[in-house]
Amino acid sequence: MPKMKTHRGAAKRFKKTGTGKLKRGHAYTSHLFANKTQKQKRKLRKATLVSPGDFKRIRQLLDNLK
């Protein structure tokens, strides 16, 4: 059986933390900023963790990621 491959699209979007959780960036950060408040834009800058409901599915895509 061939080796499992890391999903390269997912690998570019998620990083593993030291404790094994997954860090991700926010959506809605590429354009249309004129109709977002300064507070919204500020909160979107900071990275956040993947929710527990999505973690298992994303972990399968990134199985071989260090």
Curated annotation (Swiss-Prot):
InterPro entries: Ribosomal_bL35 (IPR001706), Ribosomal_bL35-like (IPR021137), Ribosomal_bL35_CS (IPR018265), Ribosomal_bL35_sf (IPR037229). This is Large ribosomal subunit protein bL35. Belongs to the bacterial ribosomal protein bL35 family. Keywords: Ribonucleoprotein, Ribosomal protein. GO terms for molecular function: structural constituent of ribosome. It comes from Geobacillus sp. (strain WCH70). Coiled coil: none annotated. Residues 1-26 have a biased composition (Basic residues). The gene is rpmI.
